[in-house]
Amino acid sequence: MHRGSRPGWRVVLSRLTDRPALLGGTAFAALLVSLPWTPALVVLVAGLWLVLGAPATLWYSISARGVSTRDGRVLVSIGLTVLTAILLALLVNTALPAIGAPHPLTRLPLGAGMLLVVTGLATAAPITGRWTWSRLAVPAGAGPVLLLGAAAIILAVAGATRLNNGLSGAVSVVALLAVAALLIVLFRRRERHSSTVTGLGLVLAAAAVLLLNSLRGWFITGHDIQLEYEVFRLTDNLDRWDISAFREPYNACLSINLLPVLLSRLTGIPGEYVFKAVFPLLFALTPVLVYRSVRNVASQAIALLSAMYFMAFPTFFTDMTFMARQEIAFLLLGCVMVVITDAARPLRARRPLVLVLLLGIVLSHYSTTYLVLVTFGIALGIDYGGRLVRRVRSRPPTGTTGFVTWWMIALVAVGAVAWTGPATDTGGQVRVTVAATVGNLLGKSSATGSSDTRYSLFGGAAVSAEQRLRDYVAFTEQQTGAERASGALLPLPVLAGHPMSVVPESAMPLTGFGALLDRIGVNVPGFNGLVRQAAAGVLQLLLLVGLVAATFARRRTFRAPPDQIRLTTGALVLLGVLTVLPQLSVDYGVLRAFQQGLIFFAPFVAAASVWSFRWTTTRLSVRLAFGLVMALFLDLTGVVPTLLGGYPAQLQLANSGQYYDIYYVHPEDRSAARWLGERTSATDVRDTFPTLVRTDSYVLLSYATVHKGEATAFYRGDAMTYRYPFGVLDATKNKIYSSDGAAIYR
């Protein structure tokens, strides 16, 4: 029994790793899933066991060859299970049409396929074949953590539901405070909690934070997820994945077509909630993976702080739930780091496991693959460079072998090229990005990068929203000149008579407490903005300090293994490149890259936060570091700005703000789209930006545009909110549909 566990009840149990019982239970689950009259709840339970439970149980046993810790094996087994589901769906989708079955992605073949996969895994898993007596033991401290975590999740679901019903975000704020309370408990009792309990607390905290955002709206809400869901629907409606039906990079990400189709078919969960709930819950494991990978090489405090920094970064709770393909890719990348840092297992067992996980990332998300390849390539170059320097200086080798090898990078690169090339022919965007980047480097072209670079210590020119709008108008006019001359687009003189202007992002009114601070001389809006800008600088500064301190300082908070130092250096160099090369900052996103980088360098940020308080006692420095990350968490998640006012609202806490106006789908929007769909067979969807409106097109204006008179366009990775010129449509078209929240012109 684990130290600190409480005695349980002696019961007759079959171990989950009992081969006959496991296979029998899985076969029964496959049968229940296949029967048309099985109740929905039974299908849900049976399907979850068939898709996730049984494979994860077997992968837990198999992964012991490359992962030494129990909780590490649990986490890696889940990642391998997700990859198994993707590969099984791909195999079924490829094999059945070849033998005359045009609809392979239906419940019966998928269920039978999963049963065969489980049977195959059972033959490889080192499991028993007998019944045994076992004790059910509850780890010490699990009760309070479970109660607090469950309360946070319930509050998060209730908070999102209240907001969707038009009520206030007060419950959502309380949910975040409950998450903060849970994190405080995890920190205060960190030495008494086992890794299992700490991981349980982290996954519950992360799930609550993510569900606050993912459950917003009764329909699919967010940016990338809108197209991701359409890719899923295309595969779902065809009962088959066919890249030729939509030959775009999104459709080459099997994490958003084959995986959700399999999950929906075998569990009965509607596809909409696979994206809004299942994927966020899987992604909630990523902070735990960060914790486990750091715990392999550092103290409990550093590992816990690392996971908290990963959760406190804004992209985690504002954007990740809107990028399902990246959620799955980050889950697999977290598993990669758990295996890399687990030095208790031999390299010959860990390297093949990492290679399999990296190939899973290739199938899940293209840009994550490219960034990982560059990071690993830089790490390998540093390793080779270090060996060369030692050889030139006639110094003996260090005796340690780097984890990353040339053949590992080569195989992943070949896999990526093969997948985006011959297999799917979706590598066009990469070629465009490379060509534009080369043009930037050679001075043959100039362009502005994403405004996200303004948060970087590496620099990045700031471009005003007004200038960005003018640039976009000029760009669209240039691109459409020939069509406009033929009369296909609205004439420029009409557009010139109704100029557009940028609308500044509105801030929440000051609360009572915020007004009190204002009366005593505190500029609350300025304070909120300063804290946000300072937070970005603090995180980057901590990263730099942590990397230097872990490498050169005499008094080190933790001794980073060479592999982690090299990978962190690679990720840091990559961030610098993304910042200074405009096209890369637009196509791959600096903030997303930093979130990905935290999987590698979170321990350096955490260690630097402790090291920066080294002038105090050891115990106090850790507490102050925890206070810093908690302050960042409460401010960046929106708790502090909501309590003060004077800052733009965040989607997870309010029915206002930029994300709400742009991405929140209202019933009026759907009604207008449905009305239009019933009256036209046109499928060519264009932009409503005035310079792109065609003379013969329908123009559907959304709820936010009709109610606020504002619309948003995207250019060079930035959103530009502008005053919509209704006069253009009034002068050139007729209004044929009008409701309380949407309008259509023709």
Regions found by a protein language model. Give the residues of each.
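Hydrophobic/aromatic-rich transmembrane helices and adjacent perimembrane loops
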Residues: 48, 169-175, 326, 370-371, ...
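Transmembrane alpha-helix segments characteristic
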Residues: 21-30, 197-207, 354, 540-546, ...
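Membrane-embedded, hydrophobic transmembrane alpha-helices
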Residues: 1-193, 583
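Membrane-interface helix-loop-helix junctions at transmembrane boundaries of multi-pass membrane enzymes
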Residues: 188-191, 347-348, 388-404, 521, ...
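Membrane-interface alpha helices of multi-pass inner-membrane proteins
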Residues: 339, 352-369
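Extracytoplasmic
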Residues: 431-505, 509, 516, 523-525, ...
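Active-site lumenal/periplasmic loops and adjacent helix-entry segments of GT-C-fold
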Residues: 185-331, 596
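Membrane-interface transmembrane helices that cradle and orient dolichyl/undecaprenyl
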Residues: 333-350
